Design a protein with these regions (language model features):
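Conserved PLP-enzyme active-site core in the AAT-like
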Residues: 5-233
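Positively charged, small/polar-rich N-terminal and surface patches that mediate targeting and assembly
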Residues: 1-3
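Conserved C-terminal alpha-helix-loop-beta "cap" of PLP-dependent enzymes
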Residues: 231, 235-333
């Protein structure tokens, strides 16, 4: 497949009117690169683990960071801004993750989609963690869904890519969704050149699309197994995983996410830092390819903090749990 065919294949997968593939390090960088969030616009975002990307990536925009990712928080941050769905603007943007932020929050995308239209806001969803397999933001009310394709490419892409998908604007009974039509007009007018993707890179993405469902189900299933192990482990605390009833968004997540609750789990160490745990583990947990087959750990609050974010691979969760258990027990004796 060439780039055009890959974009068409992703559009079919995402239920999108149109898709643009970009080379970008992450979703906020891709949104900035698109050029559709323009000077004078207001961008309201829940991204407490990605604040720098928003504060530095949108020059001339009024960037407002909110917490929690609730309708009330977004509405309050939008007060006094006279937004329009005309292509000329000015535009009000609401940005959330389908799964994201500290605690792996799952916003109520349906409620946000309805409220965004009432406020003349354009709802943008970073769907990277859940993926197109695990969430359908465009169906739920987003006008734009962006997804970093590391996991789609099984960690094998030589560059980082993001897919930007715009919602269809045609509703039932020949009605037009003004918000989606506005987003499409902005994307059409952004003047972004078609991505130059060599055949080897295109092949990685094509093969990833072909195997996506099976691999993502494996990631989701292993994340659930590891979350249940961690929730029962007395050596860690505050396990955050949308599939656990203890998660603050568990009820919402059951109606927003599909095929499970995503590939990610967060937890806190007890009287240990993330750096100490990393030193006790093999380097593979930190250096394995993002989105690849091996389970990967990161420290979203830094190595001096106690928070660990785990992205389940397709490896054996019993082996991963055993390695983690041994490392934690060893550290407890020091």
């Amino acid at each position: 497949m060439d780039v055009q065919q890959l974009e068409e294949a992703w559009a079919l997968r995402a239920g999108a009117r149109e898709v643009r593939l970009l080379a970008a390090s992450h979703v906020p960088a891709a949104l900035s690169q698109l050029g559709i969030v323009r000077p004078g616009d207001r961008l309201v975002a829940f991204a407490d683990d990605f604040t720098d990307a928003f504060e530095r990536g949108f020059d001339g925009c009024d960037v407002v960071l909110v917490d929690p990712p609730s309708v009330a928080a977004f509405a309050a941050a939008s007060e006094g801004y006279d937004a329009s769905f005309d292509a000329e603007g000015p535009h009000l943007w609401w940005f959330v993750n389908s799964i994201g932020g500290f605690g792996l929050r799952v916003p109520d995308l349906r409620a946000l989609g309805r409220a965004a239209r009432e406020a003349h806001a354009l709802l943008v969803v970073d769907n990277t963690v859940a993926s197109a397999f695990g969430c359908d933001p465009l169906r739920l009310g987003a006008v734009l869904s962006l997804e970093a394709l590391d996991r789609v490419c099984a960690g094998k892409a030589p560059r980082k890519f993001v897919a930007a998908s715009v919602a269809r604007s045609q509703l039932k009974r020949h009605r037009v969704d003004a918000a989606a039509e506005c987003a499409h007009a902005l994307l059409e007018g952004c003047g972004l050149a078609k991505l130059d993707m060599p055949a080897d890179e295109a092949g990685v993405l094509e093969r990833g699309l072909d195997s996506l469902d099976v691999r993502m189900q494996a990631h989701f299933d292993r994340a659930r197994a590891l979350a249940e192990y961690l929730a029962a482990n007395e050596m860690v605390r505050n396990v955050r995983y949308p599939g656990l009833s203890s998660h603050p968004d568990h009820v919402v997540a059951t109606g927003i996410l599909e095929h499970g609750f995503g590939p990610a789990v967060e937890f806190d160490l007890i009287e240990l830092s993330a750096g100490e745990l990393f030193d006790a583990l093999s380097g593979e947990f930190r250096t394995s390819l993002a989105g690849g087959a091996a389970t990967r750990l990161s420290a979203p609050r830094g190595k001096q903090g106690s928070t660990i974010r785990l992205f389940a691979g397709t490896d054996n969760p019993l082996v991963v749990a055993s390695v983690l258990d041994n490392a934690l027990r060893k550290l407890a004796t020091l």
